[in-house]
Amino acid sequence: MSNSTMEATQMKVKLAVDEMIDDLDKTYLRDMQKSMFQCSARCCDNKKTTRDAVENCVESCNDGMKKAQGYLEKELGGLQDQLSRCAMTCYDKLVQQFGPDVNKYSESQKLSFNEKLDSCVSVCADDHIKLIPAIKKRFAKNT
């Protein structure tokens, strides 16, 4: 894959994921974080409680945010894994078409191989960007 095409494809996916994270942050995570901080502050209101009790209370306040962040990390990791597998499938199909020894390709074969790989990986990226709305829905459902 040519560097400029690969970078453009990576940037397209990155921008789509960043946009999703920004949307989730504004729609869900900020309110969760605000509640977490308010809850944590309330844990410190009782001056008669033990330090351990305060720490346990604060930890309990953090549970929802930790769960949400863990869920989002799991979803994004799954998306990345699927995208990587798709790109590897593109590569494998082209190796089957052109032959296993890339070093034996003629210049025109290398050019054709790279163009087809660029195109296939770009389709992978587009297909996986289309999965982002479903990830957002699952996140909303699970937080």
UniProtKB/Swiss-Prot annotation:
Keyword Coiled coil: no
Pfam families listed in its UniProt record: DUF842
Keywords carried by this UniProt record: Cytoplasm
Superkingdom of origin: Eukaryota
Record has Cytoplasm as a keyword: yes
Cell location: Cytoplasm
Gene Ontology CC: cytoplasm; striated muscle dense body
Membrane-crossing segments per the record: none
Entry-linked InterPro entries: DUF842_euk
Known function: May play a role in locomotion and behavior.
Family: Belongs to the FAM136 family.
Protein name: FAM161 homolog famh-136
